[in-house]
C-alpha cells in the first residue's frame, strides 16, 4: 500500500470519526429538545406559542454559537454566564450516569466510539448552556426554577434510559412525547403546528 493511499485512508477514518462525534451532539440535542418541550409545557406551564418561541431562540443561539466568526457567543462566555449565576451545569452533567448519556447519544452497549464520553458530556453541557440563558432572559426563570428544570431533565433522561419491567420498551422516548402532544393537545411538535 502506497503512502498516499495510506494517508487517504487515515484522512477518511479521521473524517468518519469527526462525523460520528458531531452526530453524537446532534442526537443529544434532538432528544433534549423533546424533553425540554415536555418539561416546559407540563411542569412550567408554557403555552405552545411560548414553546415554539423558546425553540426558535435556542436554535438561533446555536447557529450563532457555531459561527466561528462570531466571538460574542462562545462556550466560554456561556459557561461564565452560568457560573456567575451559580448554575453548575458541568457538575449536573457529571452527575448523570454514563450509561444514560450513552443512551441519549443513541449509542447502545459496546458501541461507543473512542472519546465518546467526553464528546457526549460536552454536547450535553453545550445544549444546557444554550438553553439556560433563554429561560432566564426570555421567560424570567429564577435560579430556583433553573435548578428545578435541571432536576426534571435528569428525571426524564432516566426515563428515556430505563426499560419497563418485563418489556423491551423504555418508559419514555421522542415518539411518545410527540404522540402525547398530538393526542392530548392536538399539536405536532415535529411539524410545529396544530393537527
Each model region followed by its residue ranges:
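Amphipathic alpha-helical segments that form the core helices of the histone-fold
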Residues: 54-63, 149-160
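Short loop/beta submotifs within extracellular cysteine-rich repeat domains
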Residues: 143-144, 157
Amino acid at each position: 500500500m502506497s503512502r498516499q493511499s495510506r494517508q487517504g485512508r487515515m484522512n477518511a477514518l479521521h473524517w468518519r470519526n469527526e462525523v460520528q462525534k458531531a452526530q453524537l451532539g446532534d442526537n443529544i440535542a434532538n432528544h433534549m429538545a423533546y424533553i425540554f418541550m415536555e418539561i416546559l409545557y407540563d411542569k412550567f406551564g408554557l403555552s405552545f406559542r411560548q414553546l415554539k418561541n423558546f425553540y426558535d431562540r435556542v436554535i438561533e443561539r446555536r447557529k450563532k454559537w457555531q459561527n466561528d466568526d462570531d466571538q460574542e457567543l462562545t462556550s466560554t462566555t456561556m459557561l461564565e454566564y452560568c457560573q456567575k449565576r451559580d448554575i453548575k451545569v458541568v457538575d449536573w452533567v457529571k452527575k448523570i450516569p454514563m450509561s444514560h448519556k450513552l443512551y441519549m447519544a443513541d449509542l447502545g452497549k459496546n458501541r461507543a466510539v473512542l472519546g465518546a464520553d467526553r464528546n457526549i458530556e460536552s454536547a450535553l453541557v453545550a445544549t444546557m448552556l444554550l438553553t439556560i440563558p433563554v429561560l432566564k432572559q426570555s421567560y424570567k426563570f429564577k435560579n430556583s426554577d433553573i435548578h428545578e428544570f435541571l432536576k426534571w431533565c435528569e428525571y426524564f433522561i432516566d426515563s428515556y434510559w430505563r426499560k419497563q419491567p418485563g418489556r423491551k420498551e423504555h418508559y419514555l422516548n421522542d415518539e411518545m412525547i410527540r404522540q402525547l402532544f398530538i393526542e392530548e393537545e392536538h399539536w405536532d411538535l415535529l411539524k410545529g403546528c396544530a393537527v
